[in-house]
């Protein structure tokens, strides 16, 4: 896994923060923005989109991933996530379990990076494996197809 340049980290944080204004959160007022860096250097963005029925709500991370996948892109390097009540960033916002599972579907847990940020000076970088040490993904089903 190559190191991520500070300038790219800053760009991903800025891009994720810019998504907060698009967040549709009339129920929780908890706004989340995400920026997804592909292996070829493209950046896809996402925000959370709530629904009165709650279950159809879509998180920022999945919005960004699904946007990329819907355009034929399936190789990802890093995602940056920011979030907070009313869009005020005071602590890290980690991906929910559903988002982690979607990441397991499309990302290498050993190398895919997750940046949790408050601003360009306050952030931590994890791998997907850090957040899903015993994650279930496509690799688990390779041998089960023979059954």
Which sequence ranges carry the predicted segments?
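Feature of Fe-S/electron-transfer and energy-metabolism proteins
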Residues: 3, 7, 11, 122, ...
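Short, basic/aromatic recognition patches
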Residues: 10-25
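Small-residue (primarily alanine) positions within well-ordered alpha-helices
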Residues: 16, 34-35, 64, 68
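Short glycine/proline-enriched turns and hinge-like loops at secondary-structure junctions
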Residues: 28-29, 58
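Short beta-strand scaffold segments in enzyme catalytic cores
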Residues: 29-37
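Short beta-strand-to-turn element immediately C-terminal to the catalytic PLP-Schiff-base lysine
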Residues: 37-38, 117
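Zn2+-dependent cytidine deaminase-like catalytic core
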Residues: 45-140
């Amino acid at each position: 896994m190559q190191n991520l340049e500070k300038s790219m980290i800053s760009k991903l944080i800025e891009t994720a923060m810019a998504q907060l204004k698009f967040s549709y959160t009339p129920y929780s007022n908890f706004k989340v923005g995400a920026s997804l860096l592909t292996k070829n250097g493209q950046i896809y963005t996402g925000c959370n989109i709530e629904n009165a029925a709650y279950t159809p709500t879509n998180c920022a991370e999945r919005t960004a991933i699904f946007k990329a996948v819907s355009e034929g892109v399936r190789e990802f390097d890093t995602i940056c996530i920011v979030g907070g009540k009313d869009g005020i960033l005071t602590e890290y916002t980690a991906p929910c379990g559903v988002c982690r599972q979607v990441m397991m579907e499309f990302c290498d847990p050993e190398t895919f990076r997750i940046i949790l940020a408050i601003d360009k000076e306050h952030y931590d970088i994890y791998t997907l494996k850090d957040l899903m040490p015993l994650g279930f993904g496509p690799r688990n089903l390779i041998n089960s197809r023979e059954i």
